[in-house]
Regions:
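Helix-rich cap/lid subdomain of alpha/beta-hydrolase
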Residues: 142-197
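Conserved serine/cysteine hydrolase catalytic core
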Residues: 191-250, 259
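Conserved hydrolase catalytic core segment
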Residues: 103-142
Length: 288
């Protein structure tokens, strides 16, 4: 299914055909550009495929570039009655990959997108060519920052998330048209609900709903160690800190390591040239 982007700003900044994948009653937005070896881009929260616009434009010349919006984010549907647990996001990714018949995939994953992407990868290692992780949560021993701990308080969390832009302070310095493309999809009640469910689904104790899924993923990461891999880390990210970086180094001791000194939560906006250069060389070196 093909549609036109609803934001006027996107015609200039995001000149890609919007496509939609049906999953049950809902639509998942994605872009599918170029041809060649497959790159699958997975965004962090509360970002969306817009964060990868420069990479899509650059790599579509020699690759087939797929980038999808997670349920509840970007231009995907934002149903109030959807179960936003990790397992369901992973199921959507699996369905999309099957539907598009994607094979020998190189994943480029950021934040929550890394968690979902790795959930797929450990279950389908034969379909993974290589992977690059940008700042992401450790699968165990992850401590929520205080601002998100407060959002887990039952009587208070919804009021905070519905009333405050928790994740967008870093974009205030961006050009107005870029800022609008990030902020507009986050303003609705339905979008705020998806942000809250994301926060609530981050496991902090073994009893949390997605804790078992996270541990199962972590225990299976060894299967991917022979794959070409890289870890790219923004040093100023307040959510996924150096402690997470050290865990990812333990997961993949042979991975190429890169640190971006001046980049923060919105890594692709803070260091676009550096990020593109690292990825270009990685893809060339491993012929991905």
């Amino acid at each position: 299914m093909i549609d036109s982007p609803p934001l006027p700003e996107l015609k200039k900044l995001f000149p890609f055909q919007s496509r939609y994948f049906k999953t049950g009653r809902y639509k998942i937005h994605y872009v599918d550009e170029g041809s060649g070896p497959v790159l699958l881009l997975m965004h962090a929260c509360p970002m969306w495929t817009f964060a990868f616009r420069d990479l899509i434009w650059k790599f579509r010349k020699n690759h087939r570039v797929i980038a999808l919006d997670q349920m509840g984010f970007g231009l995907s549907d934002k149903p109030l009655d959807f179960d936003y647990r990790l397992e369901n996001h992973t199921a959507i990714l699996e369905s999309l990959i099957r539907s598009l018949e994607l094979h020998n995939i190189t994943f480029i994953m950021h934040g929550r997108g890394s968690t979902i992407g790795m959930a797929y990868a450990v279950r389908n290692p034969e379909n993974v060519r290589a992977f690059v992780t940008l700042n992401a949560m450790a699968f165990s021993d992850f401590r929520l920052p205080l601002r998100l701990q407060i959002c887990r308080i039952k009587w208070l969390g919804a009021k905070i998330v519905m009333g405050i832009d928790l994740f967008t302070r870093e974009i205030k310095h961006m050009p107005p048209d870029v800022r609008e493309c990030y902020e507009q999809p986050l303003r609705s009640h339905e979008s705020k609900n998806a942000q809250l469910r994301f926060i609530e689904d981050i496991p902090t104790v073994p009893e949390d709903e997605s804790a078992q899924s996270m541990l199962e993923i972590e225990s299976s990461l060894w299967m991917l160690r022979a794959k070409p891999s890289a870890i790219i880390w923004a040093k100023k990210d307040w959510l996924y800190t150096s402690k997470c970086y050290e865990k990812w180094k333990q997961y993949f001791p042979e991975a190429e390591l890169y640190k971006l000194d001046s980049a923060g939560r919105y890594l692709s906006e803070d260091a676009p040239t550096q990020l593109a250069s690292i990825l270009t060389e990685f893809l060339r070196r491993y012929q991905c």
